[in-house]
Curated annotation (Swiss-Prot):
Organism of derivation: Euglena gracilis
Stated name of the protein: Photosystem I iron-sulfur center
4Fe-4S ferredoxin-type domain span: 2-31, 37-68
GO molecular function: 4 iron, 4 sulfur cluster binding; electron transfer activity; metal ion binding; oxidoreductase activity
InterPro entries in alphabetical order: 4Fe4S_Fe-S-bd, 4Fe4S_Fe_S_CS, PSI_iron-sulfur_center, PSI_PsaC
Length: 81
């Protein structure tokens, strides 16, 4: 099963989500669209276990984790949309 971490434009670049991830799915990348100049990205979504520690660590409720079941069906696991 694949998990995808959805990233939105309210990231403050604090890196708390990156540090909270037990499988190192997240990393910070340059991003001009936020004040911090960097944003959390999830290049290794296949390693995500859906624990939502990144969501819990995020001070701005910025992240959303979704579980994709098959090609078109999804079940939301996130808090922020």
């Amino acid at each position: 099963m694949s998990h995808s971490v959805k990233i939105y434009n309210t990231c403050i670049g604090c890196t708390q989500c990156v540090r909270a991830c037990p499988t190192d799915v997240l990393e910070m990348v340059p991003w001009d669209g936020c004040k911090a100049g960097q944003i959390a990205s999830s290049p290794r979504t296949e390693d995500c276990v859906g624990c939502k520690r990144c969501e819990s660590a995020c001070p701005t409720d910025f992240l959303s984790v979704r579980v994709y079941l098959g090609s078109e069906t999804s079940r939301s696991m996130g808090l922020a949309y």
